Amino acid sequence: VPTGFHGAELAKVEYGDSVCVIGIGPVGLMAVAACALKGAGRLFAVGSRPNCVEAAKYYGATDIINYRSGDIVEQILDATKGKGVDKVVVAGGDNDTFIQAVTMLKPGGRIGNVNYLGSGEFIRIPRVEWGCGMGHKTIAGGLMPGGRRRMEKLVSLLEYGRLDTSRLLTHRFKGFEHMEEALMLMKDKPKDLIKPVVVL
């Protein structure tokens, strides 16, 4: 929950914004939920796994972009009549995802990155699509902040029914002896997995 919400914060999503969340694993799904709570208008979610697609719709996605159906930038530009989106939250993908994010972003737009980019020497930013440095396209990224007050705010969303995280939990285990099994699920990522939970 905290990391996905931080993606929406980094992107500075405001009411009425058109937003694209790239990647709809657990973090991206919570980014979708956060963008919806912040009042996003048209909310695109990029992903392909059926259970994640259904969860993205549940959390507020208005449009699903399946990267297996073609280039995601072309799909976004087609859907927006060539305009692109106001904000992008990067919650998945690889180093080339930034090329896509910058390209689909409107001038003056903002990218919030919460995806760990652990390989490669450089992140490429396309010059023309970035407006040759004059397009006022902002990229913000970082670890999610911690702290008691922040966690209390997030918990209040659960407490008062503004956020339901149950759609994330696809595999439930009872007892510490199942910890390894749950961790292996996260490593292997079967198609029906979003997030496992072990109740101690």
Regions found by a protein language model. Name each.
Residues 90-100:
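Beta-loop-alpha module in the N-terminal Rossmann-like domain of NAD(P)-dependent dehydrogenases
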Residues 83-89, 109-110:
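Short SAM/SAH-binding signature in class I
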Residues 114-115:
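Acidic carboxylate diad motif detector
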Residues 72-82:
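Conserved amphipathic alpha-helix within the SDR
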